[in-house]
């Protein structure tokens, strides 16, 4: 493979659809590889725009906007970083010869909970929670009765964790349904009603596909990451997981099956729920995963580098754990503060093995993820203790 110089003829170029913290890390890895980076998002000054060669502020639900930028830039790889993308535009672009990573149909399937559940439970026959689909209040009531209380209502499409509503009794169903769809992407009123299970722990199995030297596509999994989401969104993760080897092998088998069926190139973040003796498929992201931020500290090759390498046709034959590690988010507690400031960074960094990554988001809202603390240790328990302490010290003002 030949890689040219950025901003010159013959450069290799990636186009990021979404410029959040995951996109920023991909952009940094791409810059290190000598690639040209173009970043898109719906708002200006998004994190990946800080480290891109060019940026565009567009509505990515508008197919004409996406196609216009792609036609102008003609990237070697189009990488979807967020959920709010017009996937029909990606399918059209792919049919016209552009490489969409991992592939356009996978992006479309993974961003729709209903289609994803059909794919996993009905096509692949993977173990999942009990579920039903509904698109109005009466159907939701019937679904909740069939599934049993307590149960969860989730929008067909939403960003991670948003719109997940726990329902304990029939009297609360209508309000819960309205709350859930208020977080939906687009105009869909469809939801998935799921059995509520006691979660002992959750795993993310990072599974990636790349071109080998023989041009065949190889699928590999990384040692599972463990995490817990107290309010349906990522707070902390640690690597490696503490679950048994048998649970890890089952989880990796599920993830491998999902990635091979979805196909394409790049990394998938496959989410697994462990509930008693049940090991259940939950969701899959067609990109680096937020819980995988821990690989910036734990692994010799992090998830972002893997994804970019695969996107442009480079191999990643092996990923090694170099240290037990943990990550913990830094959340904003303020609303609508532009140009926020971070206090006590020096105190957090006094803890040995701690790194602080600030994402550079231009404005806060309550519980917005503004940064992450990473730490290594002799064990994941030691690393977790460090990141919890360090993240509690840092204030967003």
From Swiss-Prot:
<dbReference type="GO" id="GO:0005524">
    <property type="term" value="F:ATP binding"/>
</dbReference>
<comment type="similarity">
    <text>Belongs to the PurK/PurT family.</text>
</comment>
<dbReference type="GO" id="GO:0006189">
    <property type="term" value="P:'de novo' IMP biosynthetic process"/>
</dbReference>
<feature type="binding site">
    <location>
        <begin position="368"/>
        <end position="369"/>
    </location>
    <ligand>
        <name>N(1)-(5-phospho-beta-D-ribosyl)glycinamide</name>
    </ligand>
</feature>
<dbReference type="GO" id="GO:0043815">
    <property type="term" value="F:phosphoribosylglycinamide formyltransferase 2 activity"/>
</dbReference>
<dbReference type="GO" id="GO:0004644">
    <property type="term" value="F:phosphoribosylglycinamide formyltransferase activity"/>
</dbReference>
<feature type="binding site">
    <location>
        <begin position="194"/>
        <end position="197"/>
    </location>
    <ligand>
        <name>ATP</name>
    </ligand>
</feature>
<dbReference type="InterPro" id="IPR013815">
    <property type="entry name" value="ATP_grasp_subdomain_1"/>
</dbReference>
<keyword id="KW-0067">ATP-binding</keyword>
<keyword id="KW-0460">Magnesium</keyword>
<keyword id="KW-0436">Ligase</keyword>
<dbReference type="Pfam" id="PF02222">
    <property type="entry name" value="ATP-grasp"/>
</dbReference>
<dbReference type="InterPro" id="IPR054350">
    <property type="entry name" value="PurT/PurK_preATP-grasp"/>
</dbReference>
<feature type="domain" description="ATP-grasp">
    <location>
        <begin position="118"/>
        <end position="312"/>
    </location>
</feature>
<keyword id="KW-0658">Purine biosynthesis</keyword>
<keyword id="KW-0547">Nucleotide-binding</keyword>
<feature type="binding site">
    <location>
        <position position="271"/>
    </location>
    <ligand>
        <name>Mg(2+)</name>
    </ligand>
</feature>
<comment type="subunit">
    <text>Homodimer.</text>
</comment>
<protein>
    <recommendedName>
        <fullName>Formate-dependent phosphoribosylglycinamide formyltransferase</fullName>
        <ecNumber>6.3.1.21</ecNumber>
    </recommendedName>
</protein>
<comment type="pathway">
    <text>Purine metabolism; IMP biosynthesis via de novo pathway; N(2)-formyl-N(1)-(5-phospho-D-ribosyl)glycinamide from N(1)-(5-phospho-D-ribosyl)glycinamide (formate route): step 1/1.</text>
</comment>
<dbReference type="Pfam" id="PF21244">
    <property type="entry name" value="PurT_C"/>
</dbReference>
<feature type="binding site">
    <location>
        <position position="361"/>
    </location>
    <ligand>
        <name>N(1)-(5-phospho-beta-D-ribosyl)glycinamide</name>
    </ligand>
</feature>
<dbReference type="Pfam" id="PF22660">
    <property type="entry name" value="RS_preATP-grasp-like"/>
</dbReference>
<dbReference type="InterPro" id="IPR016185">
    <property type="entry name" value="PreATP-grasp_dom_sf"/>
</dbReference>
<feature type="binding site">
    <location>
        <begin position="21"/>
        <end position="22"/>
    </location>
    <ligand>
        <name>N(1)-(5-phospho-beta-D-ribosyl)glycinamide</name>
    </ligand>
</feature>
<feature type="binding site">
    <location>
        <position position="290"/>
    </location>
    <ligand>
        <name>N(1)-(5-phospho-beta-D-ribosyl)glycinamide</name>
    </ligand>
</feature>
<keyword id="KW-0479">Metal-binding</keyword>
<feature type="binding site">
    <location>
        <position position="81"/>
    </location>
    <ligand>
        <name>N(1)-(5-phospho-beta-D-ribosyl)glycinamide</name>
    </ligand>
</feature>
<feature type="binding site">
    <location>
        <position position="283"/>
    </location>
    <ligand>
        <name>Mg(2+)</name>
    </ligand>
</feature>
<feature type="binding site">
    <location>
        <position position="113"/>
    </location>
    <ligand>
        <name>ATP</name>
    </ligand>
</feature>
<dbReference type="InterPro" id="IPR005862">
    <property type="entry name" value="PurT"/>
</dbReference>
<dbReference type="GO" id="GO:0005829">
    <property type="term" value="C:cytosol"/>
</dbReference>
<dbReference type="GO" id="GO:0000287">
    <property type="term" value="F:magnesium ion binding"/>
</dbReference>
<dbReference type="InterPro" id="IPR011761">
    <property type="entry name" value="ATP-grasp"/>
</dbReference>
<dbReference type="InterPro" id="IPR048740">
    <property type="entry name" value="PurT_C"/>
</dbReference>
<feature type="binding site">
    <location>
        <position position="202"/>
    </location>
    <ligand>
        <name>ATP</name>
    </ligand>
</feature>
<feature type="binding site">
    <location>
        <position position="154"/>
    </location>
    <ligand>
        <name>ATP</name>
    </ligand>
</feature>
<dbReference type="InterPro" id="IPR003135">
    <property type="entry name" value="ATP-grasp_carboxylate-amine"/>
</dbReference>
<comment type="function">
    <text>Involved in the de novo purine biosynthesis. Catalyzes the transfer of formate to 5-phospho-ribosyl-glycinamide (GAR), producing 5-phospho-ribosyl-N-formylglycinamide (FGAR). Formate is provided by PurU via hydrolysis of 10-formyl-tetrahydrofolate.</text>
</comment>
């Amino acid at each position: 493979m030949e890689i040219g110089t950025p901003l010159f003829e013959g450069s290799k170029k990636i186009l990021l659809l979404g410029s959040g913290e995951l996109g920023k890390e991909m952009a940094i890895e791409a810059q290190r590889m000598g690639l040209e980076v173009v970043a898109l998002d719906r708002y200006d000054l998004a994190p990946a725009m800080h480290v891109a060669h060019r940026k565009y502020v567009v509505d990515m639900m508008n197919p004409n906007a996406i196609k216009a930028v792609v036609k102008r830039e003609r990237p070697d790889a189009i990488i979807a970083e967020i959920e709010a993308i017009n996937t029909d535009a990606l399918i059209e672009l792919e049919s016209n010869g552009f490489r969409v990573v991992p592939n356009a149909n996978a992006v479309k399937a993974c961003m729709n909970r209903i289609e994803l559940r059909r794919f996993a439970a009905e096509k692949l026959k993977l173990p999942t929670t009990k579920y039903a689909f509904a698109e109005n209040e009466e159907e939701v009531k019937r679904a909740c009765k069939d599934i049993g209380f307590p149960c969860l209502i989730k929008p067909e499409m939403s960003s991670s964790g948003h719109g997940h509503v726990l329902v304990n009794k029939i009297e609360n169903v209508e309000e819960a349904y309205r709350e859930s769809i208020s977080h939906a992407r687009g105009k869909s009123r469809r939801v998935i009603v799921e059995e509520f299970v006691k979660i002992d722990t959750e795993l993310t199995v990072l599974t990636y596909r790349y071109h080998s030297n023989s041009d065949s596509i190889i699928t590999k999994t990384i040692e599972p990451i463990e995490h817990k989401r107290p309010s349906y969104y990522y707070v902390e993760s640690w690597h490696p997981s503490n679950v048994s080897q048998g649970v890890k092998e089952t989880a990796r088998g599920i993830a491998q099956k999902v990635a091979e069926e979805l196909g394409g190139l790049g990394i998938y973040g496959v989410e697994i729920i462990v509930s008693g003796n049940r090991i259940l498929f939950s969701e899959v992201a067609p990109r680096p995963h937020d819980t995988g931020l821990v690989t910036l500290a734990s692994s010799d090759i992090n998830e972002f580098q893997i994804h970019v390498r695969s996107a442009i046709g480079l191999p990643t034959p092996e990923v090694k754990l170099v240290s037990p590690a943990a990550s913990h988010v830094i959340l904003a507690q303020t609303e609508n503060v532009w140009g926020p400031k971070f206090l006590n960074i020096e105190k957090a960094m006094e803890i040995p093995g701690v790194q602080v990554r600030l994402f550079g988001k231009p404005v806060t809202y309550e519980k917005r993820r503004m940064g992450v603390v990473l730490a290594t240790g002799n064990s994941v328990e030691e690393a977790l203790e460090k990141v919890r302490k360090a993240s509690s010290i840092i204030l967003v003002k």
